Structures are given as structure tokens and as C-alpha cells.
């Protein structure tokens, strides 16, 4: 439900918000297991460019709208040290193709794209550096049903192909069923049920989860 704390939890895990107490531990490529809460701001910023990615609900929040599609992808590579223009443009072209955007749109700005294309461009921008963990906040929110289906197929394929871990916030149980191996149900800032996705959706135990499933899915 709205206001249950899903996005707050996601933003805390991703380092956008600081928790009042506790730790967020992540097995980094560079230094092994670290508490990201105690990292310095430069360390956390580099982590968000290398090991992590964040896909916003509204693509405009994750893109630079006054920069070309290729530039949006290329900037992410430059942030982790890439400098050769030809290599950067080649990687950008490759990733546009992987998210089903024609390479002849590489010099177009995102403002000329549809909502679905903007979201696919945001995904390319985030995944080009090969992150290990992707945070997604309502990645299909506000899109037409047909556009949602195409985006979900794309996301599922990329997550599997790249061996990514993903933490997804959504109120859409169809998205949960398609993308999530495990499910956590929240209400009023508390976790009320957790488990394997199929198990929770097919045999919900908590009263709120039962109500949620019965109102949305036929299981």
C-alpha cells in the first residue's frame, strides 16, 4: 500500500537516506563486506557508480534530459574512468541496442523519447558499468500496460543474462510474480510477511497479505 515505507526502505538501503540506527552491509568488489552507512560520501558515491545502480520510477529523475541518449550512457562510463571516445560511443551504441533503442537515436535527447523509451534508456545508463545490485523503485509505474509488459520482459532478460541481484519496490503483484524470487510485504512501516514469492502469493499467511492477494490476483 502507499505510505507503507517501501520507498523509504529502498532509499535507505541505497544510501540516499541515513538510518537512525543499524547497519547496511554489502559485499563490495573492492573491499569485501562493508557497512555502507559508515562509508564516507566519496566511497558511497563510487559504490553507486560501480557495484550499484538505481532505476527511478520516473525516468526523468535518473536521466539528464538535456544530454543525448549516447551521452547519458557515456557519462556513466566516464564516471568510472573511461576516457576513449570511440570506446565509450561503441559501448553506448551496444547498450542502446540491448534495451531496444535504435542506434540512429544515439544523438537524440531523452525529451524526444516516449515514456517507455526513456525508462529503457535509464536502464541502459545504469547497467552499462556492470553493477552487481540494482535498486528499482516502481520501474513500470505510470506506463501503459503494453509498455509495461515489454519493459518487464527486458528487465527479466537483463537480470538473468548479467546475473544481477535486484531489490524492487512495487505495489503491482504481477511485477512481483514475474521478477522476484523472494517477496517482503510491508504495512505501516513494518514487514508483515516474507518468503519465496510463489509461496507467499499462493499461500499467504498474514491477514493483510491475504487481503492484498485476493484483491489483485486470482491465485
List each language-model region with its residue ranges.
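A short, surface-exposed alpha-helical micro-motif characterized by mixed small hydrophobic
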Residues: 176-178
Amino acid at each position: 500500500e502507499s505510505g507503507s515505507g517501501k520507498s523509504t526502505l529502498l532509499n535507505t538501503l541505497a544510501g540516499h537516506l541515513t538510518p537512525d540506527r543499524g547497519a547496511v552491509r554489502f559485499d563490495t568488489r573492492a573491499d569485501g563486506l562493508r557497512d555502507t552507512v559508515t562509508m564516507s560520501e566519496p566511497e558511497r558515491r563510487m559504490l553507486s557508480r560501480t557495484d550499484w545502480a538505481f532505476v527511478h520510477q520516473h525516468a526523468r529523475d535518473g536521466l539528464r534530459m538535456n544530454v543525448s541518449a549516447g551521452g547519458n550512457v557515456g557519462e556513466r562510463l566516464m564516471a568510472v574512468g573511461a576516457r576513449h571516445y570511440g570506446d565509450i560511443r561503441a559501448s553506448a551504441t551496444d547498450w542502446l541496442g540491448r534495451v531496444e533503442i535504435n542506434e540512429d537515436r544515439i544523438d537524440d535527447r531523452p525529451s524526444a523519447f516516449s515514456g517507455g523509451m526513456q525508462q529503457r534508456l535509464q536502464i541502459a545508463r545504469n547497467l552499462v558499468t556492470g553493477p552487481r545490485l540494482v535498486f528499482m523503485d516502481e520501474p513500470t509505474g505510470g506506463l501503459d500496460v503494453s509498455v509495461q509488459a515489454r519493459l518487464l520482459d527486458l528487465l527479466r532478460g537483463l537480470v538473468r543474462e548479467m546475473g544481477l541481484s535486484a531489490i524492487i519496490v512495487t505495489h503491482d503483484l504481477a511485477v512481483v510474480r514475474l521478477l522476484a524470487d523472494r517477496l517482503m510485504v510491508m504495512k505501516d512501516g513494518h514487514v508483515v510477511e516474507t518468503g519465496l514469492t510463489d509461496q507467499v502469493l499462493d499461500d499467504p499467511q498474514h491477514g493483510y497479505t491475504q487481503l492484498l492477494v485476493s484483491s489483485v490476483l486470482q491465485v
